[in-house]
């Protein structure tokens, strides 16, 4: 029997990434087959030919963007030494960048932008600051530590980050962990981790995110949203906080559960609190309140509890 501990003072949630965009199962399978076919059988073709084969007959801009996103995150690796050799990716052909197959966020964003352009998608490259970015430098008059993209789908701009979507960099170097969390991110989610000094798309103005508030938001805030928290609640909580963590992670089964309803407070207030989680994996889930273990009631795949803090 699996038991998940939900701590009372700081909610400890596994970061089970939810799909950023949902396709019907049969459509997803068809796109996946197309992607795998082009990657496995068309490797000898040049980039333009592979892109045409990848997107030929695709009418949906969302599907085109997804195919390109997946192509980039599955092909390129994060490699700072290679990035130093490349320098400005704009001075290299797409063929050369694909042959090298790696680099920094500048390479990822440049390749993504050029492929979006070739596919007829309206897209932009964004220079700004990101929560996990390092080595902040001045780009013109703006502080910059990361580069990403935005693409317009059905009249709305969405954040796309192929760098973070490709995987993570740890002590052992780059580990490929493809994720859809960074594809077509909703604006209210993107503002938790990305700050565009120019606010080109009005995301920060819409949600009242200033530079000072952005600095307060903890790095894990976006992952709390990935686990199921409402991004607006996370953002509102940070307006009065000091940047305390929202999420704590420990050994878990990735994607094991989804948050349906939970407080987004660093410290629980003395009023009834409703917890509702959904999981096909865990048989039992509990809240630890002081020295008490309080079991959530299970009905089907839903675990729920109304908690009255002492």
Language-model segments: which ranges?
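Residues at beta-strand starts and edge strands
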Residues: 7, 145, 271-273
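Hydrophobic/aromatic-rich core segments of domains that either
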Residues: 110-190
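N-terminal secretory signal peptides that target proteins for export/translocation
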Residues: 1-2
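Sec/Tat signal peptide C-region and signal peptidase I cleavage site
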Residues: 17-22
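Secondary-structure boundary elements
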Residues: 23-104, 110-113, 119
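Sterically constrained small-residue positions within well-ordered secondary structures
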Residues: 13, 114, 140-141, 266-268
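Alpha-helical and coiled-coil interaction segments, frequently adjacent to or embedded
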Residues: 170-310
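Bacterial N-terminal signal peptides
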Residues: 5-16
């Amino acid at each position: 029997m699996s038991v998940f501990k939900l701590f009372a003072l700081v909610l400890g949630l596994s970061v089970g990434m939810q799909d950023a965009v949902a396709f019907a199962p049969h459509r997803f399978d068809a796109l996946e087959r197309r992607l795998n076919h082009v990657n496995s059988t068309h490797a000898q073709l040049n980039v333009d030919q592979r892109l045409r084969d990848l997107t030929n007959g695709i009418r949906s801009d969302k599907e085109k963007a997804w195919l390109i996103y997946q192509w980039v995150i599955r092909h390129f690796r994060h490699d700072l030494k290679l990035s130093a050799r490349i320098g400005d990716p704009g001075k290299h052909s797409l063929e050369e960048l694909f042959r090298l197959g790696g680099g920094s966020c500048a390479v990822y964003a440049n390749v993504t932008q050029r492929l979006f352009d070739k596919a007829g998608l309206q897209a932009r490259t964004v220079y700004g600051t990101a929560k996990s970015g390092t080595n902040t430098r001045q780009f013109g008059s703006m502080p910059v530590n990361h580069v990403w993209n935005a693409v317009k789908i059905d009249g709305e701009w969405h954040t796309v980050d192929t760098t973070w979507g490709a995987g993570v960099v740890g002590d052992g170097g780059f580990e490929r962990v493809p994720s859809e969390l960074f594809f077509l991110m909703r604006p209210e989610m993107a503002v938790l981790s990305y700050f565009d000094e120019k606010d080109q798309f009005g995301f920060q103005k819409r949600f009242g995110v200033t530079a000072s508030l952005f600095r307060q938001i903890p790095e894990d805030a976006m992952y709390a949203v990935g686990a199921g928290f409402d991004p607006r609640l996370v953002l509102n909580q940070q307006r009065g906080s000091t940047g305390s963590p929202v999420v704590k992670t420990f050994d878990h089964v990735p994607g094991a559960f989804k948050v349906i309803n939970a407080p987004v407070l660093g410290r629980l207030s003395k009023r009834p609190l409703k917890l509702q989680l959904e999981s096909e994996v865990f048989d039992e889930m509990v809240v630890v309140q002081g020295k008490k273990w309080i079991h959530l009631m299970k009905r089907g795949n839903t675990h729920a509890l109304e908690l009255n803090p002492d």
